[in-house]
């Protein structure tokens, strides 16, 4: 057993260096995630709320009316050192258009993500039927990654 223990430890070190839930990352075709992430926020979603709003700013002419679709996800942080408390999803724009990059605010413990409106139904379906996780990774080269994903689900 003493001879096997160091071998098991050596084999597990590369696994320990990888962030939790790294198996859910897409292939790194552009080699942006070669180094270990400098920070990870991982949240298991336990509650959500949806806000569909309309706004009219009366001091502007012509008077524009804007509408927004937002979702607030709350849950429990899972990764070591994670401080995340909530995720604010804003749905705007169209698929294929450039969206704002993911941003984590340490002060408010809020991760802000932007998705095209076309992703709303997919995300609602996940929230209604699966355990959902939100992951945010930052890298020393300035690259950031954020996603919503389920755990591994067995087919029925």
Residue ranges of each PLM-predicted region?
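Acidic, glycine-rich flexible loop segments
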Residues: 98-151
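Bacterial N-terminal signal peptides
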Residues: 6-14
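Predominantly extracellular/secreted and cell-surface proteins with exposed
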Residues: 70-111
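Positively charged n-region of N-terminal signal peptides that target proteins for export
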Residues: 1-4
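Short, solvent-exposed mixed-charge patches
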Residues: 154-156
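A structural detector for beta-sheet-dominated domains
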Residues: 46, 51-53, 70-74, 90-92, ...
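OB-fold ssDNA-binding interfaces and closely related basic DNA-contact patches used
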Residues: 18-84
């Amino acid at each position: 057993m003493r001879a096997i223990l160091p071998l098991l430890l050596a084999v597990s070190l590369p696994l320990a260096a990888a962030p939790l839930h790294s198996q859910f990352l897409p292939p790194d075709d552009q080699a942006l995630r070669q180094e270990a992430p400098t920070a990870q926020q991982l949240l298991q979603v336990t509650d959500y709320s949806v806000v569909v709003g309309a706004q009219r700013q009366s001091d502007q002419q012509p008077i524009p009316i804007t509408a927004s679709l937002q979702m607030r996800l709350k849950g429990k942080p899972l990764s070591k050192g994670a401080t995340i408390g909530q995720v604010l999803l804003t749905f705007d724009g169209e698929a294929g258009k450039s969206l704002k990059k993911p941003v984590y605010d340490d002060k408010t413990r809020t991760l802000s993500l932007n998705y095209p409106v076309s992703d709303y139904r997919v995300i609602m379906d996940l929230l209604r039927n699966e355990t959902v996780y939100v992951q945010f990774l930052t890298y020393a080269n300035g690259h950031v990654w954020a996603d919503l994903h389920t755990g591994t689900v067995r087919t029925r």
